[in-house]
Amino acid sequence: MSCTTVPELGGLMDRGGTSGRRIVVSLKSQQATLYHQGKVVAVAPISSGREGKDTPVGRYSVIQKSPDHRSSIYGNYVRNGKVVKENVDNRKTPRPAGSKFEGVPMPYFLRFTGAYGLHAGNVPGYPASSGCVRLPKRHAKRFYDAVRIGTPVVVQR
């Protein structure tokens, strides 16, 4: 699936405010849709939370935007620039002596509740994340550039 944009609406994405914009995430179809004034502006494939790490269903709004966000939970332990323990959940895996935690990159992060947000990441075609909504990088940037703090986000089954 590719991200589609309605050309005649493209310029509307750059205007300030949240009026008329919303993001709808469909967990069933594994896609995110960006609307403006009720019309589809863009559609992108996603990867939502895998079993046991479910993406929360509900009505939210964008509460933080961070173009170069890093996870505060998932990542690697690094010592002297070298990874000494990879793919850790720092709440569960003790930090090796002399190492520091380096969170996994989450570019174009749009937080919508707690520890959950939309961001660029691997999209294998099925739910595979730790709960966030991953989009291909170019689509994540498009959504990031189009929305503002306060933009509604609906996550539905």
Describe each region flagged by the PLM.
Residues 40-43, 149:
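Short amphipathic alpha-helical segments with coiled-coil-like heptad repeat character
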Residues 5, 16-18, 57, 76-157:
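Exported/periplasmic cell-wall-interacting domains
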Residues 36, 44-45, 53-55, 73, ...:
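A short, polar/proline- and glycine-enriched secondary-structure boundary/capping micro-motif
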Residues 28-30, 37-40, 49-51, 65-68, ...:
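Solvent-exposed coil/turn segments that connect beta secondary-structure elements
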Residues 22-26, 31-35, 45, 61-63, ...:
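Soluble periplasmic/extracytoplasmic beta-strand elements of cell-envelope proteins
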Residues 60-72:
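Short, solvent-exposed cationic patches
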Residues 9-22, 27, 42-52, 57-60, ...:
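N-terminal post-signal-peptidase region of extra-cytosolic proteins
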Residues 1-2:
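C-terminal motif of bacterial Sec signal peptides marking the signal peptidase cleavage site
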